[in-house]
Amino acid sequence: MQHTAPALPSLLRRLERPTGPVDVVLDTDTYNEVDDQFALSYLLASQEQLSLKALYAAPFFNENSTGPADGMEKSYAEILRLLDLAGSKFPSELVFRGSQNYLPNEETPVFSPAAEHLAKLAREYSPDHPLYVVAIGALTNVASALRKAGAEVHVVM
């Protein structure tokens, strides 16, 4: 799949500080390390500037999991646990399970509910109103969504 890069002025404009609230999704391996829990807490506490649209559980594999699928499931459960602890009214139906494996290569996406949702959601945005993607885990969900969505998406990562 061949993609063309946006013109330099367009790219530079995307780097400017937004003047109002921005729409954000968080792709996170929340169970893996504590920084992800802080990031989620910050997003929940910053809804005037950051309009949270979805949460995606990312895969991870280390001593805290038996494999990427187990890491993703633990992160999914941790997201729900943190939302409950925070007393958040963020709808649980906007929390999505991510990929159960890592990307096998640069061309092959790994589909998941998270990747499907992000691909669909990203198509609703424009260069003047981009979707901000905060990815602080493995990039499998985001890369798979971008592969699926194609060149018509407008996201800032």
Which ranges hold each PLM region?
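Short N-terminal helix-initiation segments at or just after the protein's N-terminus
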Residues: 1-2, 78
